[in-house]
Amino acid sequence: MAVQQNKKSKSKKGMRRSHDRVAVPTIVYCACGEPTVPHRACPSCGTYKGRQVVAQPNE
């Protein structure tokens, strides 16, 4: 196992970790008004790009 030869400073450690954050998901609103994730079919109405792609059970 590798062992470091010199101590990494707080600055160098912070610079290395600068990209480790969790990305905030982008939220868009469907034509039905429900929030959804981009490039996915709407879970509430089943539409994608204005077309019905997921069959919804009759209510």
Swiss-Prot record:
Classification via InterPro entries:
Ribosomal_bL32, Ribosomal_bL32_bact, Ribosomal_zn-bd
| GO terms for biological process, alphabetical | translation
Give the span(s) annotated as Disordered: 1-20
Q: Could you tell me where the Basic residues compositional bias lies?
A: 7-19
* Keywords annotated in UniProt: Ribonucleoprotein, Ribosomal protein
Q: Which PANTHER family match?
A: 50S RIBOSOMAL PROTEIN L32, LARGE RIBOSOMAL SUBUNIT PROTEIN BL32
- The name this protein goes by in its record: Large ribosomal subunit protein bL32
Query: What is the species of this protein?
Result: Nitratidesulfovibrio vulgaris (strain DSM 19637 / Miyazaki F)
Name the encoding gene, please.
Answer: rpmF
